[in-house]
């Protein structure tokens, strides 16, 4: 596996989106505060801090594990950086610095790679993979609740300022980018997975995730208008089910028990919004059950609003929103079927080995125990 110039540009774009997302979240929170909407300001800030703090915890835990594996002592400067919310930026610095060296200093077309050059590419791929996992954590922990909040405010007031539109756009971009970036990193870091070559598989996977996610978020927003307590109870119930599912599957992502417990809590939260294979096994049945429940839940929420219409927001919005929910859900399921029917990373057939090479050894990395697609 080689870290290419295209991969480097994706990493650069990734940090640009990451920084933009943080700036817009802070901007929206401050704007709400100045307008006297203290609850919305606190919620926006809390979502941002929640996602960032969890990402910093995992980042520092991985730094410690990597140093221990290398036989080095844990450095206090790394702890200080993560306490100051600089862990992800530190990782981006190391990844971009080494990635530039790997992508531009060595000619990827030459077959005359020495062992040192191969190790450099492996190191960069591992660093970028760690970043993609952290971004996936932060996106779903912060971006999804933030997007629901902004959609709720938009429908409640019937209009929004530029900062709110910016927050919605950036949240969608962050979710889209982290999802595709995660897919690319997954395939690149695990040699037994087929590479995600071409634009079509990436777009198909992106639309599958984005459409099913948007449909569910709009449904949750409608439920919030119906009854906030019922909506929160449903989300907490789904979170609890996700945590139980993670414990039932006995995930083994972290070496530390406390971090593994946190990981399962985070997995449960992510499962509220979208499905991931949390154990790397055949999940045809669980995925089918997940999206059947998703369809039934969405139709149930829409039925309640159609049978008992509530004058809680501009009724002119309800018909377009209902159509959007149904269409995005159908399109999401359609792209899901196309993706798993044509582009799913089934384990490639075992290659024949000659007497010199022997049987290839699967490379050990964190991604192998992380969320699969």
Curated annotation (Swiss-Prot):
The chain crosses the membrane at residues 8-28, 38-58, 166-186, 203-223, 224-244, 256-276, 295-315, 318-338. The record marks 357-358 as: Cleavage. Belongs to the XK family. InterPro entries: XK-rel (IPR018629), XK-related_scramblase (IPR050895). It holds the Pfam family XK-related. The keyword Cell membrane applies. GO terms for cellular component: membrane; plasma membrane. Keywords: Apoptosis, Cell membrane, Membrane, Transmembrane, Transmembrane helix. It is a multi-pass membrane protein. This is XK-related protein 9. The gene is XKR9. Activated upon caspase cleavage to generate the XK-related protein 9, processed form. Does not act prior the onset of apoptosis. It comes from the Eukaryota. One of its GO terms (biological process) is apoptotic process. Its main location: membrane. It is found in: Cell membrane. The keyword Transmembrane applies. Coiled coil: none annotated.
């Amino acid at each position: 596996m080689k870290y290419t110039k295209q991969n480097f540009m994706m990493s650069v774009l990734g940090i640009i989106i990451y920084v933009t997302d943080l700036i817009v979240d802070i901007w929206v929170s401050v704007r709400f505060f100045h307008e006297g909407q203290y609850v919305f300001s606190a919620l926006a800030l809390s979502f941002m801090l929640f996602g960032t703090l969890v990402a910093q915890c995992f980042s520092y835990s991985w730094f410690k594990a990597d140093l221990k594996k290398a036989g080095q002592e844990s450095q206090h400067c790394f702890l200080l950086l993560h306490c100051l919310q600089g862990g992800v930026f530190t990782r981006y610095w190391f990844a971009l610095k080494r990635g530039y060296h790997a992508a531009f200093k060595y000619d990827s077309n030459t077959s005359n790679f020495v062992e040192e050059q191969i190790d450099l590419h492996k190191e960069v791929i591992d660093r970028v993979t760690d970043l993609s996992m952290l971004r996936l954590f932060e996106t779903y922990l912060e971006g999804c609740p933030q997007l629901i909040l902004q959609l709720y405010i938009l429908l409640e007031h019937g209009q929004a300022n530029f900062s709110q539109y910016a927050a919605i756009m950036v949240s969608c971009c962050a979710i889209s980018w982290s999802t595709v970036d995660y897919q690319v990193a997954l395939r690149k870091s695990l040699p037994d997975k087929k590479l995600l070559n071409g634009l079509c598989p990436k777009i198909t996977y992106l639309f599958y995730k984005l459409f099913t996610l948007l449909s569910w978020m709009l449904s949750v927003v409608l439920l919030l208008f119906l009854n906030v307590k019922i909506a929160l109870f449903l989300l907490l119930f789904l979170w609890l089910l996700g945590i139980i599912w993670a414990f039932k599957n006995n995930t083994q992502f972290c070496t530390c028990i406390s971090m593994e417990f946190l990981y399962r809590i985070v997995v449960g939260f992510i499962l509220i919004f979208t499905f991931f294979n949390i154990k790397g096994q055949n999940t045809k049945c669980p995925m089918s059950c997940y999206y059947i429940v998703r369809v039934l839940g969405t139709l149930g929420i829409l039925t309640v609003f159609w049978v008992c219409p509530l004058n809680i927001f501009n009724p002119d919005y309800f018909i377009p929103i209902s159509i959007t929910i149904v269409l995005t859900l159908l399109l999401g399921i359609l792209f899901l079927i196309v993706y798993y029917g044509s582009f799913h990373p089934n384990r490639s057939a075992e290659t024949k080995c000659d007497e010199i090479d022997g049987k290839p050894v699967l490379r050990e990395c964190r991604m192998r125990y992380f969320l699969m697609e």
